[in-house]
Curated annotation (Swiss-Prot):
The lineage of its organism: Bacteria, Bacillati, Bacillota, Clostridia, Eubacteriales. The gene is rpoB. CDD domains: RNA_pol_B_RPB2. One of its GO terms (biological process) is DNA-templated transcription. This is DNA-directed RNA polymerase subunit beta. Belongs to the RNA polymerase beta chain family. Coiled coil: none annotated. Pfam families: RNA_pol_Rpb2_1 (PF04563), RNA_pol_Rpb2_2 (PF04561), RNA_pol_Rpb2_3 (PF04565), RNA_pol_Rpb2_45 (PF10385), RNA_pol_Rpb2_6 (PF00562), RNA_pol_Rpb2_7 (PF04560). It is an enzyme of class 2 (transferase). The RNAP catalytic core consists of 2 alpha, 1 beta, 1 beta' and 1 omega subunit. When a sigma factor is associated with the core the holoenzyme is formed, which can initiate transcription. DNA-dependent RNA polymerase catalyzes the transcription of DNA into RNA using the four ribonucleoside triphosphates as substrates.
Amino acid sequence: MVHPVQVGKRTRMSFGKVKDVTEMPNLIEVQLDSYQWFLREGLHEVFEDINPITNFTGNLVLEFVDYKLDMDNIKYSVEECKERDATYAAPLKVSVRLQNNETGEIKEQEVFMGDFPLMTEQGTFIINGAERVIVSQLVRSPGVYYNYSIDKTGKKLYSATVIPNRGAWLEYETDSNDIIYVRIDKTRKLPITILARAMGFGSDQELLDFFGEDERFRASIEKDNTKTREEGLLEIYKRLRPGEPPTVDSAISLIDSLFFDAKRYDLSRVGRYKFNKKLALNLRIANQIAAMDVINPSTGEIMVEKGQKISRLLAEDIQNAGIKSVDILVDDKLVRVISNNFVDITKQVPFDVSDLQIKELVHYPTLREILDNYSDETTIKEEIKKNLSRLIPKHIIKDDIFATISYELGLPYGIGYVDDIDHLGNRRLRSVGELLQNQFRIGLSRMERVVKERMTIQDQESITPQMLINIRPVAAAIKEFFGSSQLSQFMDQTNPLSELTHKRRLSALGPGGLSRERAGFEVRDVHHSHYGRMCPIETPEGPNIGLINSLATFARVNEYGFIETPYRIVDKENARATEEIRYFTADEEDQCLIAQAKEPLDENGYFVDKKVTVRYLEDVLVVPATDVDLMDVSARQIVSVATAMIPFLENDDASRALMGSNMQRQAVPLLKPQAPIVGTGIEFKAAVDSGVLPKARNAGVVTFVSANEIRVKRDSDGGTDNYRLLKFKRSNQSSCINQRPIVNKGEIVFKNQVLADGPSTDLGEIALGKNIRMGFITWEGYNYEDAMLISEELVREDVFTSMHIEEYECEARDTKLGPEEITRDIPNVSEDALKDIDDRGIIRIGAEVRSGDILVGKVTPKGETELTAEERLLRAIFGEKAREVRDTSLRVPHGEAGIIVDIKVFTRENGDELNPGVNELVRCYIVQKRKISVGDKMAGRHGNKGVISRILPEEDMPFLPDGRPLQICLNPLGVPSRMNIGQVLEVHLGWAASKLGWHISTPVFDGATENEIEECLEKAGYNANGKTVLYDGRTGEPFDNLVTVGIMYILKLAHLVDDKIHARSTGPYSLVTQQPLGGKAQFGGQRFGEMEVWALEAYGAAHTLQEILTVKSDDVVGRVKTYEAIVKGENIPEPGVPESFKVLIKELQALCLDVKVLNENHQEVSLKEYTDDEIADLEVNIEGSEESVPVVPVVESNIEEVEVEVEVEVETETEDGYREDLDEIEYDENFEIETLETDLELDDFNDEH
């Protein structure tokens, strides 16, 4: 039954029945742990891989001895980096040793290898002042994969692929004649026996003795035209290097370099682990019948007698005894199973080797050799350390190749199994650390080439490590990765949930991953191995669906990059769920029967029912309680954080739940956040881990609290911890970040306690929206098609008001004609326009600005015309005339307005780092308060979204019997067809809870039942069906039927009408067609497309049509004259010839067609072409005003809106449907690319939107 639960500072009434057996892990540990691994081990591995660099003669050796990140010399703190557009990084110092083998001289030096970006505590990076996130990538794990296809006759043809981390691929395939072929590195195929011969089995008999009798192998031998090892080698060489003269030596060295050279071929730790797991004997021979006695080679004892069935445990012992092959009987046929001969070292070595830190299996022949040659413990350990690269090879070895062939031969007999590439046991995660490591490796290998070249050129006596090493390639590789990799994304900072989700995102796209076009349905689909690892619900709609996923709540990533999920261990004999928790990867879980978290247990953990519902692979079975292996730890284990925040998720249709998860991430932080009355209990954990809340570093007592700062006196040593709060800072998405203290002076705080609320949080819980009194009722058609009718109260009381901070910057640069100047002295500007500008030429903080107002006064020198000799003489006599300047001030763009909250000025004199050519940089921050308005998009948490259609006076809204009016009316028709019934349950429970004064926690899949909701409604004194009489606010009459009324949690989404509305009178035109550009960012016109033209044609609106095709679009002269006529109030003149028609004629003439244009009297019309200068001279001359309007305004990225809508962009498509009008934009030489970056950033960061 319902019970109170303490969440931070708030008590919630919880309906959860399952008590969580384990804590949820830190939600951003996937980022933090991976980066820490990189600093600890990843860098070390890369330096080990590249060591030593020798020159071509081998007498100079360069080695990287040690490295350290110099944390004391970090230039700027995180906050300063954001202000100064700097990168948060620490210098990487590497000790390098150079040895001259001729003279024996050794030089050691510490070399600076560039600044290395550091991860903040929140799991992000600050790159050039912008907060970025590195998204983890899901890729296919290196290893060996078996598959089959079915040919025309219905026969299974098996194939295999050996995929390394980097290096040549090996592919096996069978044709319908049962011949097995191999492809080496995607070349033409050869019979597989050629590869086996080249690896050392020359004659046919040797092959058959080793691999055993097999028809497919015999068929391959017959197809093979080589008979000895040498012929096999030459045949492979001819295929791989056609046209070169083949010799046995060159063939051997070619194969060695392709497969057995650690620099060229890398399996990686994961690849080696997967190889050993797949090719080991134990899984292949378990439950099979032995054809011969199996004898332990080291002791001589018989482990399995002929004809005996091999149990699972016995199979493990055989594997670890170092037995290479076992013959088994399948339907009275003898099949030989060959392993790659790797064993568990602890089963072979008589003493404890845990201090050697060997976690993988080791190669048995190499280990045997060490054990046979040495006897005492210390020497054996020394030798094992020395031979680690042979014991655990990073490349493949011959034994691996033989074992893969043997596996291929065994598959038709049911020995082994084929792989499913979409199974999470075969897909792994590359997180930040590994992605960085790969980038760093690329940089180092480029550097290695430079070092080798310099070794040969420079004088060997005076050479030092510093002279050899060029750090440019390394720094460039890292910079390129953070700046432009598809996986380095501009952080989605709309609200704390979107930050958290972004850090937990898993993408299958990116370098080395899939591409959107190539990804089929199978990759995108939900797989049974996703359970508890990847959320089946949260993924974007659109082309990226299923390729971008989210980590489940309890999931974590293991050292190999596989995702694990926790389960409770079940004591099978007693059918009792223990308290022991173990993490399982997807392929470990596949052998188990797993009970649900909601399965009823008694107080000692015994299953109540004799029969239990369990999951096994993709099936749901009912089995006796004594057969259950594992049990889920929590009901929310299967979903991601955003999805776990939807109450009554189990009552929603999956596609609506998907929209609900995605829309919560778009909720704008409101002025006064309010935690949901009906929550799911995960809100607190999500807010704390997202990194927007300041937490106490140590336990202590609060000694001082203000809006900007909190001080805590530490218990441990009596010192003071200071916490600065962020006030009105701009986020990446222009929302407002503001922190407010929630502790009082004298309060005792414990370590990690939340001290202040951030954006969208309330008492430390995520609060994305507001609890609203609403009813499901139609009202005069204003709720048609999901629209929402809202009360004026929501506007007046600032319920859905949000703050938005925009940043504008202005640079003063050096131009060819002299430096630009930031000044108050601007030509042709009235004093009135400068009333808020200070003497520096910069607007004051607190000023209210509207579009077109000056923010920063700036003048740029104008080019002087060539002077005549007389003018130069006069100039020389009478002194210099003042040089001409033009006004290039920064103004508020169209459609923007607000209050200046902050100004930042950076100059060279103050020692600020600026881009080359920039002398001064000014940034202005404008804050807007946006109230809710018609056209804004709102949504609930269940995918129920809509646009506001009308704001009704409070007195006209339907009202309750106690006189309270509703705040929102939703359409009841939006519920049944969408099947998101969760919203109705939420409304009922919220109605009861608000009356009882409760905040509720109803966890997903474990929440309040219908009966419990009814009980709550009755307890609160309402009808058990949750309906009530509602009165019409205009007439006071009751509506005919009872209406469902209650409290729903509603979010205001980031799609605000103010950002979308747009109009233009004149503006920029496309260069070739002279038609207006499209889109708000380009300040474009409205497109009047093909179908719209048909509509006018259908009604015979000839004049309108002519106007749209000419003066409102690309009749260059006509549009100027028309503008003039409208302003002066005259009649619109006759239109001329559209520019795009001239372009068409020119294109036909370019095809050597002599096209002439004739008028109705068959006279030729001359099509005058305008040069750019003539177009520029066409200026609208409006009588009585000195201002003239240029025809071709320059594109400024900041322009947004004008009131009058005149111009129309006409559709012109070339044959292949490519839109010309976006082709070229008019620009002037001083237009800086940087200004466009604001528009581009979002696209970079978010492939998915």
